Amino acid sequence: LSTKLSKKSFKPSRPPKFFRPKPNGMQRTITILPVEDALVYQAVANSIASNNYESLTKNNAFIFGSVLNEEVKEGITLLNNEDAEFYFFKHYLSLYKEFSNKVNESIELGLKFVLETDITGFFDSIPHYNLLSVLSDEYKVEENVLDLIGDCLNIWSGTNDGLTPGVGIPQSTEASSFMANIILHNLDNILIEKALPYFRYMDDIRIFGDTQEELRE
């Protein structure tokens, strides 16, 4: 794989996909990436995460979905520890419990209104151009890596019925959850600056306020 990448001969493969029912009756497209594709995708995510750990975790008091583990900042030096047990994200169950606790605490404070929303078909609707632009402008990802990821995302897009070039990232991978958080990072900054109680678990968002007007703003 490393030889293919260095010679720029690596080509992503079209992955198998299937639908998983959601509680609301809709369907989620699950993508099973081939091993080499998954390794490349995760390696890119690892590099971005370790190089930008501080900026990516500054909002962790408000963000609870797919939160980076502290070991991420050590980057490839983790490979020097043969006994290390490393996970890219903190465990989701404890994070979701913390998210729920924060929501309940805001309710107990007596805040009268809550805006509760999520982004329909979030992973399937992420524009590749937007993601690649953020990776380039804010995280200084090199052009050859952007080209590689762009090619991969196009091949991985859509459903078994066909591609959706330029739109959608594959669900069921940690790298995609990481990229999804990157897309929402600027939204986090905007809402946190408004100083309203704001909490997010991936694309599941809660904003609390004393009036409907301040939430509409």
Predicted region positions:
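Reverse-transcriptase-like RNA-dependent polymerase core
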Residues: K4-P23, D147-S157
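Catalytic micro-motifs at enzyme active sites that drive phosphoryl/nucleotidyl and oxygen chemistry
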Residues: S6, P15-F19, Q27-L33, K97-I107, ...
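Short, conserved non-catalytic motifs in the polymerase core
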Residues: S13-A43, N60-F86, T159-N181
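Short, conserved acidic/polar surface loops in the N-terminal third of protein domains
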Residues: T31-I32, A43, Y53-K58, S125-H128
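Short, hydrophobic/amphipathic alpha-helical patches that form generic packing surfaces
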Residues: A38-S50, D151
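Active-site-proximal segment of RNA-dependent polymerases
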Residues: A49-V114
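Conserved polymerase palm-domain catalytic core
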Residues: E85-M202, R206-R216
